Amino acid sequence: MPWIQVKLNATSENAELISDMLVEETGALSVTFLDAKDTPIFEPLPGETRLWGETDIVALYDAETDMDLVITQLKASAVLDDNFAYKIEQLEDKDWEREWMDNFHPMKFGERLWICPSWREIPEPDAINVMLDPGLAFGTGTHATTALCLEWLESIDLTGKTVIDFGCGSGILAIAAIKLGAAKVVGIDIDPQAITASKDNATRNGVAEQLTLFLPQDQPENLVADVVVANILAAPLRELSSIITAHVKPGGALAMSGVLDTQANNVASYYSDNFTLDAIAEQQEWCRISGIKK
């Protein structure tokens, strides 16, 4: 059915108050926060909900809603200024599931690696194909950090190697490593949902026997590999640098992403004593740090 959308501008200080008011007083069915100024926010503290300095609030209503009454209620609210700006838009009825699926296409990384959603035809059946559908909020190859790691894995010889995917998420990097020739891969993640997602995706790709998955507290001691890839964030890459370094065999390779260009040199400094680092690779505002352990 069709919907009515109302967009308001807010600040980080009053956005949640406005959201509560839209739901409780005007009957909004959903409320979404959007960045009004294209300003990234990363690494909130545990339990913290960060919002942008200028935040757009988008509220969704049933098409039968009396929007004149909604606007009257908004104007009477103490949360909003008297002269607040708003935009009302009628949303056409669509097959939203089909619309969502249409946005995902097979993606190629390097010369031979493809990530393909299950509902799409495989472009190159003889290439290395990882079947992976979006879900569970974990990587599917669309983000620059995942792409940087996939391109790196595709560029090195993994034949017969052992690999650790540190922060495995969906398992996309671990599965790609196996399909690229790795003999055995270990995936580690703090989130039990990630372990479940990785296991399911590995089974779907026929590589479950080569993938072992651990929560950090369950992993064996002295776990090392020829290749380690860690697509997480700058803060844990700094805080866990000694642990990540210890996972790499002497002469082994390490690649890390989840790092902004403004953070890359600082993160690299935590590894430069133990690794001969490559030039930092960049895609959009994201970076990959890689090197060989001394």
Curated annotation (Swiss-Prot):
Gene Ontology terms, MF aspect: protein-lysine N-methyltransferase activity
Subcellular location(s) of the protein: Cytoplasm
Gene3D superfamilies to which the protein is assigned, alphabetical: Vaccinia Virus protein VP39
Catalytic reaction list: L-lysyl-[protein] + 3 S-adenosyl-L-methionine = N(6),N(6),N(6)-trimethyl-L-lysyl-[protein] + 3 S-adenosyl-L-homocysteine + 3 H(+)
Binding site for S-adenosyl-L-methionine: T146, G167, D189, N231
Matching SUPFAM superfamilies: S-adenosyl-L-methionine-dependent methyltransferases (SSF53335)
GO cellular component: cytosol
Positions of transmembrane segments: none
EC number: 2.1.1.-
One GO biological process term: methylation
Entry keywords, A to Z: Cytoplasm, Methyltransferase, S-adenosyl-L-methionine, Transferase
Family: Belongs to the methyltransferase superfamily. PrmA family.
PANTHER family attached to this UniProt entry: ELECTRON TRANSFER FLAVOPROTEIN BETA SUBUNIT LYSINE METHYLTRANSFERASE (PTHR43648:SF1)
Protein function: Methylates ribosomal protein L11.
Name assigned to this protein: Ribosomal protein L11 methyltransferase
Gene symbol of the encoding locus: prmA
